[in-house]
Amino acid sequence: MTHKTQYKIALLFLFAGLQGVFAQKKDENIGTEVVNVVKPYTPTISDAFKVKETPPLEDEDNTKKEEIKYNIFSFPVASTFTPAKGRAASVDKAKQEKLYKNYATLGVGNYGTLNAELFVTENLNRNEYVGGMLRHLSSQGGIDDLLLDDKFYNTSLDLTYGNQQKDFSWNVDAGYQHQVYNWYGLRNDFANDLADPQDRQDLINSIDPQQTYQNIYLGGRISAKESIFKEASLKFNHFSDAFGSSENRFYVKPTVGFEISGNKINANFIVDYLGGSFEKDYFGTTAINYGFTNIGIQPSFVYQQDDLTVNLGAGLFYSMDNENSDNKFFVYPQITATYRIVGDVMIAYAGAEGSLKQNSYRDFTQENFFVSPTLAIAPTDQKYDIYVGLKGKIANNVSFNIRGSYKNEDGKAVFLSNPYNNENPNQEGYAFGNSFSVLYDNVKTMSFFGELKADFSKNVSFGINGTFNSYKTDELAEAWNLPELQVAANLDFNITEKWYAGASVFFVGERKDIFSYTSLLRNELETVTLDSYFDLNMHVGYKYNDRLTAFIKGNNLTSQDYQKWLNYPVQGIQVLLGASYKFDF
């Protein structure tokens, strides 16, 4: 081979290498080159490493936290590179972890804590499946310096049956939940105005603080493909407690949609009925009955051009107060917009949205277990929530989201501690200043939110978010029990193939409530500031094999004696030791 020929071949390889480098920097047609390789080709495959992308950002609804979906995009590269025939080297494939359909978990801890879960699912045939989940969490209590019992139980059973056909799918769900809680929030100085200590002890012993909640539901969902009718969901819920309270709720939510000239037109319909009763009010004089039927339609039109997506919609609701014949009509803006400033790397979004929220006794009990069965139930008129934000990617595996908003809500519900009056004829276990009522007011909220998520590698992920709120009320002196600042962070990592660990922390700022105590010798009415609190939780797990995993969890590891609600201290350091087993039938 002559020197000239060698130079030509070297220049040819150099040109091809430079072309490949620049092709990585720009999204351009790289052209083609024919390369004749005379050396036998011995390919090797490096260890696979999946880059964890941040969530897709071309969503139409920027105000809600959507389910994160990771997508892998394949980019075709024009090439006529044809290596000479050779024998590929052997590749050591990583062992793929087997996936199981079912699992069982059992854990025990201090404070007499028991945590158990059982999840099973099975395909009956190609189109049908059934599933169920049983969950239990309980504690025998034991918080220091309490005057009343603080144990709790929470057990639920959920069942589902589904059927998937070519053009549509549907499923039905049913479930039952049983919960036991205690109104243990008595101040340590309760009834200290009684002259005889035995009288004080007898009064405390006469209080039965236990409350029981029961919930039964039946629901279903159907969705269709290639049809104007998109989907519909419905649910019936019956909720009751140990004091004769009863609540029924039924709703149906169909959705239709079609396209005109490539633009999507959708309409969501809703019929939401709520009816219930309490045997008596807080002072034991009269029964409380309530009922509301809300009917709404939410049409929307989606406009897209280049990097701009606009969803123009409105919400029209008619609310009927079935007990007081007080019917109202509401109109809400439902407008969202996104603009991709730099592709998926930086997206600006904004919106103005409102809706009519149906409040219920069950919803309040799940937010605050210690409410009294004497509540005033009414819907909330969420007039508008105007917001602007920016989200995107700082790097391929780091995403961010910042948002500012101004919200106006008429009839926003807040919790307030109930007063104690020794002349109250109602002597139920919640009538000693150890329960909470619900108040409503027009509340305007200015909010700032920031979030950062990162997957540093396939073994380490981190997230942090914070929210600052400023409240303005019309009639209430304060936005009771609403914190101005909340911060949360989490870190998860795989130590080895067998060991994994994680930690989460959260901070909740100060809140305000009212303490009211009235007796013959004692009359107190004061605004109480609940201290901010910081909570640290950690867990460590060991994967014995594909099926069996052991774990240990620790909650409130800083052992802060904080109060989530007035006079309701939480458990101190909590440790849970358990195991999880995965299986198939």
Predicted segment positions?
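Bacterial Sec-dependent N-terminal signal peptides
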Residues: 1-27, 346, 491, 573, ...
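Outer-membrane beta-barrel translocator/receptor signature
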Residues: 84-86, 95-104, 108-145, 149-155
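Surface-exposed extracellular loop regions of Gram-negative outer-membrane beta-barrel proteins
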Residues: 122-144, 266-270, 290-321, 455-470, ...
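Flexible loop and strand-edge segments within Gram-negative outer membrane beta-barrel domains
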Residues: 139-152, 173-249
